[in-house]
């Protein structure tokens, strides 16, 4: 159990350190052009059940995000709610990739901590797929939920799925 926590913590720290993000904001003098760009941007937003392809790296499909009553009796950090995310991943690269570091949850813009239940930590060979991988998050406040999706050590940008979990 301690080795799993150390591995998970190390991978999370590595993902945070190595993930870079850039945001581009385009402005237009015409409000019509701005509205059209926003419509196109919204239509390309990733959604649950829709495959997200990261060029020559991975294809990730977030299948579901549900609240669970399951708790880890050994976890010292309290969790008001636990969100369990289930996803499929396919390795599109020519090298093994680590599984379990693709997702980050933000609640009201604040990063939620991973919660140690049903966490899939694995590796995936080239051109292979893993179905029903899971990742859990501790959610301690109400608000908007955004799931960031990005393969571990990816150079391509992350994708954000806005969640509406009841």
Annotate the PLM regions.
Residues 10-12, 16-166:
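Conserved functional micro-motifs across diverse proteins
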Residues 1-8:
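Bacterial N-terminal signal peptides that target proteins for export
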